[in-house]
Structure formats: C-alpha cells, structure tokens
Amino acid sequence: MNQKLLHTANPFADPGDGTGAYNVYKVMYDAVAEGLTEEDYSTTDWEGCKGMINNGQIACMVLGSWAVPQMKEAGDNADDIAYMPFPITLTSGKQAASVGPDYSFGINASTTEDNQAAALCFVKFMTEESGFSYDCGGLPVAIKDTRLPDFYAAFKGIDFVVDEPAIEGEEDL
C-alpha cells in the first residue's frame, strides 16, 4: 500500500466496497461528526487521558500497541483495557493490521571495533533477552521469540501486514 499510494490517481476516493483509505478515514470522520470525540482533539491531555480511559470516561482511542501498557498502569481497571484491530476489511475479505517498527537500534560504523562489539552485545541483549518489545506491547523482534502480549488475543485470524520500504528514489516523497 505505501508503495502504491503515491502512484494512485485518487487514493482517498471511496472504492464503494467498504475498503481502502477512504473508509478508514470515514470511520474517524463519522465519529467526529456524531459528537463521539472530545470537542478539541488537537489539545488532548495525554497524561490525563490515560487515567480517563482506565476509569471509563473515554470509551475508545485509536493508538498503537505501545500505548496499552501505559493505559493499563494509569488506574485500577487494567482488566478493562483491551486492544483490537481497526474495524476495516480488505477486498480479499480478510482483516489485516498494519505493523511497523518503533524505535530502531544502530551501531556507529565510525567508532572503534571494541565499541562496535559492545554495541552489538547491547543490541542482541535488547532484542533477544531483555523482553523489551514484549513489555512495551510490541510484536516479537527476535526470530525465536513468538510470545505476544495477552492483549493481542483479538488479533487471532488477523493478517499482520508490514509496510514495504519506499521505492528507491521516492524515500522523501
């Protein structure tokens, strides 16, 4: 999708079948039009909203999995916090969820070999042993790690779709 969007004549047009970018944005548009969102969503108090969703003052938020642990820790109702795929279906009839990386680790190619070796040990520890991705609500990073946080239960049968890298020469479009 991310490689085709730039080359689509009208990428946000309604395809008429309940799929595509138009219908993702239509869900959000309808929620605002029907008064189901806060009056000024551009000035949301991030810290305050975590407690508000935890105690039931906010019903739903469109966020990534990284936010789930924060919402659970923001009050006494952690069991009330859940995570679900965005309710849109592909033309294939399947439901999918877009996945992508959070922060990335890098090793400075200009530093000493000793520093590079130490950095590699740190990256291996973070990705293979620390549980960082799991604890933050992410998908496994290491090939051997198949654990998913419990809140991914709603994703059973959902295809995870990873964005393709930008086409060479179009990285900054």
Per-region residue spans from a language model:
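Solvent-exposed, polar/charged alpha-helical surfaces in well-ordered, non-transmembrane soluble domains
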Residues: 22, 26, 30, 51, ...
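Short helix-initiation/N-cap motifs at beta->coil->alpha
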Residues: 40-54
